A protein has these predicted regions:
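Active-site rim/adjacent substrate-binding subdomains
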Residues: 1-139, 144-189
Length: 189
């Protein structure tokens, strides 16, 4: 089932997500729905808070970045209860987008290497180093677990310039090809 994505301004996006256990209700169905939602929305990552679930879960699929970024090929996995242990390497700029902030693309500086600890969808533990576009995608999705969104990474002046667009998104005044929940959309009577 394709899930609606919550838009900028929704309180779930600002909350720190909670860890889950293997007995989390309907986890397998949620993961399946998130994969379907990600494919439908043509994104490269989706965090549970973006589908209004304040839990520490995100999925990534780097394939849309291939062939421009060869290491994105076949990078498709789930991260549960992830803990970002270290960021290192060079700070690299990249124009990022976010399904919760449709049609906004902003340059974000991020380290090009990370070390992360997480559980896979079978709750098997992993600790890995990722770099390049893989590290970028993971950091973006991890931000959602910590209550951060794309606009939190832009310079204050740029964020001020974006305010009218962000307000419009929260009110549902944007063109988007996937279902969304708009926190400040006015209902017609």
């Amino acid at each position: 089932m394709i899930l609606p994505i919550v838009a900028y301004g929704h309180p779930t996006l600002k909350a720190i997500a909670q860890p889950i256990t293997p007995d989390y209700p309907e986890l397998e169905a949620l993961l399946q729905d998130m994969w379907e939602t990600l494919a439908h929305s043509e994104g490269v990552g989706l965090a549970a808070p973006q589908v209004n679930k304040s839990i520490r879960l995100f999925i990534v699929d780097g394939n849309p970045f291939y062939p421009d970024y060869p290491d994105a090929k076949d990078f498709k996995q789930a991260f549960i209860n992830a803990e970002l242990l270290e960021t290192f390497g060079e700070e690299v700029p990249f124009k990022e987008g976010c399904l919760s902030l449709p049609n906004i693309y902003e340059e974000v500086m991020r380290p090009d290497k990370i070390r992360i600890k997480y559980l896979d969808e079978h709750f098997q533990p992993h600790e890995e180093v990722f770099e390049g576009i893989r590290a970028r995608i993971i950091q973006h999705e991890y931000d959602h677990l910590e209550g951060h969104v794309l606009s939190d990474h832009v310079a204050p002046l740029r964020k001020t310039l974006l305010q009218s667009k962000l307000r419009a998104i929260s009110e549902g005044k944007c063109d988007v090809d996937y279902r969304m929940i708009f926190p400040h959309k006015k209902r017609h009577r």
